[in-house]
């Protein structure tokens, strides 16, 4: 991902304020509520029968935290996202058979959640930088599918 120094600073400055536990669970939960067909990848997570059940599900929260942990790692390796996400790409492609379009959806949901949490601080410039990052991460996660 090519970010200007200003974009990189904006991304890292905001990310330093992110509560990964909270935002991760909220982002994954929103993905499962807004795009219910994505729930098929989470059969083992128990009750996903309603928005309240999804958002309160401890397995959704735990996996969301794990997802954002990997995203955080990616932020430390923006120049090598494909390498950083190679194993996760292979896992999601070969073993889990996740539609790579879902990575884009999750990235966009993450941007919405960040906007919700940070309000005015999440300026259009910050959003533009995050859109580049989530697109780069989605592309890296889809790499093994090509």
UniProtKB/Swiss-Prot annotation:
Domain (Globin) spans 2-146
What is this protein's function per UniProt?
A: Involved in oxygen transport from the lung to the various peripheral tissues.
> Which positions bear Phosphoserine?
44
Family annotation (PANTHER family): HEMOGLOBIN FAMILY MEMBER, HEMOGLOBIN SUBUNIT BETA
List the expressing tissues.
Red blood cells.
Q: Give the residues the record marks as binding heme b.
A: 63, 92
Task: Give the protein name, as stated in the record.
Answer: Hemoglobin subunit beta
Output the Gene Ontology terms for molecular function. Answer: haptoglobin binding; heme binding; hemoglobin alpha binding; metal ion binding; organic acid binding; oxygen binding; oxygen carrier activity; peroxidase activity
């Amino acid at each position: 991902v090519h970010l200007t120094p200003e974009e990189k600073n904006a991304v890292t400055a905001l990310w330093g304020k992110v509560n990964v536990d909270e935002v991760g669970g909220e982002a994954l939960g929103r993905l499962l509520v807004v795009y219910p067909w994505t729930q098929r990848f989470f059969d083992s997570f128990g009750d996903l029968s309603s928005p309240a059940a999804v958002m309160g599900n401890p397995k959704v929260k735990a996996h969301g935290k794990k997802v954002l942990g990997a995203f955080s790692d990616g932020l430390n390796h923006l120049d090598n996202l494909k390498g950083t996400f190679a194993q996760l790409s292979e896992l999601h492609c070969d073993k889990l058979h996740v539609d790579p379009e879902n990575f884009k959806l999750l990235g966009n949901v993450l941007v919405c959640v960040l906007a919700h949490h940070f309000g005015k601080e999440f300026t259009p410039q910050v959003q533009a930088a995050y859109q580049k990052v989530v697109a780069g991460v989605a592309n890296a996660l889809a790499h093994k599918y090509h």
